[in-house]
Structures are given as C-alpha cells and as structure tokens.
Amino acid sequence: MADEMAWKNLGPNPSRKEILACWNPEDAGFWEKYGKRIATQNLYTSTWALVLSFVAWTLWATIAAKLKFIGFNFSDDQIFTLAALPGLVGATGRLFYTYLPGLIGGRNSTFITTALLLLPLFGLGRALQDPTTSYETFVLLVSFIGIAGANFSASMANIGFFFPKANKGFALGINAGIGNLGVSLIYLTAPILLGWNLSSLFGEGVPGPDGMMYVQNVCYFWTI
C-alpha cells in the first residue's frame, strides 16, 4: 500500500522520471493528476510512430512488382521471396520486440525502433537507382525493413503499461487502429510518388510501361 500511495509524496513540480517511478494508473487520484496527461502524450507519439512503421513495412509490396520494369533481371521466385521477407521478419521479430519497452523504456523503444527504419529506407532508395545492385543486397535491405512490422508488438506493450484497465482497450484500439492506417496510406500514395518527378530531390527516373517511373521516391519521401 505504501508503494501504491508513493505518488502523494511527490513535490509540487515532479519530473517525468519521478512520476514514472511511482506509476499507478489504477489509482484515480494519480491518474487525474499525473497519469492521464503522460499516458495521452505517449499514445499520440506511439500512434504516429506506428503509422510510419506500417508505411515502411508495407512499402516494399508496392515496389517489388516494378523491379523488372526498371532494369533488375531477377527471377519470379526471387521477386516473390523479396516480397515475402518483410512479413516473415516482422512476424518473427514481434516475439522479441514485445519485451523491448520493459528493457529500455517505452520512449526509448519508440524512438530507436522508428529511427532505425531510416537506414533501410535510404538504402533501398539508393539500391533501386542502380540496376547492378545484387539480389543479396536487396535481401539484406528488405529483411531490415521487415523489423518495422515488429514495432507493432513493442508499441502495444508500451501503451498497455500506461493506461488503467478501464481505458486500456480504448487506448490499444486507437494505437492499433490508427497505426494500421499506414498500410492504406502507402497504397494510396505509392502510385502518386511513382509517377511524380522529384528528380531535383531524389534522383532521375527510368522509363516504364506507362511513362517515367521514380521508384526511389516511395522510399525517400517517407524519410522526410
């Protein structure tokens, strides 16, 4: 009981670290005074990060079928393997990412896992502009981007910690529901980005069956 009421000993302007040290969202007084504000901030941040993660995770599906049109002589088996890798890596990674917020903290896990996605996105953007890029390089980059799918479990575990049981279902629903809109977002924007001449920013396009294609745009756009 003493630990549960520790928040009442906090000073007039406690730091975030001090509040988290005595986190008890089931206490109505704590929740109204400290918990609700911090939990809501985390929900906003986590949801937006999850949108970006789902964008990155699904992004390759909009590109894989275009490889043959931009000079890559991969077999159908190789292309389908590349298309499957993000799902395989993401699903496997969720087994481990569930524990990440507890190991390094929710804020750290959200920032690190989202920031890491910049590496494969930049890498794929460069690789797609060079038809001599090896298949093995694509396997590495596409597998790396698959960790975006694992971010889902870390995000849900993080949000679940901050909310009381009475609000947890709503918070997790917002996080997962809006986060999954990233899938729709990439399918909506990819066709636009593929045909949008942004060569001054992202490099030249290549001739495709329906005009110039700027496949790298799909990767680079989401890094900014």
Which residues are covered by each model-predicted region?
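Cytosolic juxtamembrane N-terminal segment immediately preceding the first transmembrane helix
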Residues: 1-55
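Extracytoplasmic
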Residues: 41-72, 186-190
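Central cavity-lining transmembrane alpha-helices of secondary-active solute carriers
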Residues: 81-101
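C-terminal ends and interior cores of transmembrane alpha-helices
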Residues: 115-132
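Hydrophobic core of transmembrane alpha-helices in multi-pass small-molecule transporters
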Residues: 120, 134-152
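Glycine-rich segments within core transmembrane alpha-helices of 12-TM secondary carriers
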Residues: 149, 169-198
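Intracellular juxtamembrane helix-capping segments at the cytosolic ends
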Residues: 150-164, 172
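Symmetry-related core transmembrane helices of the 12-TM Major Facilitator Superfamily/SLC fold
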Residues: 212-224
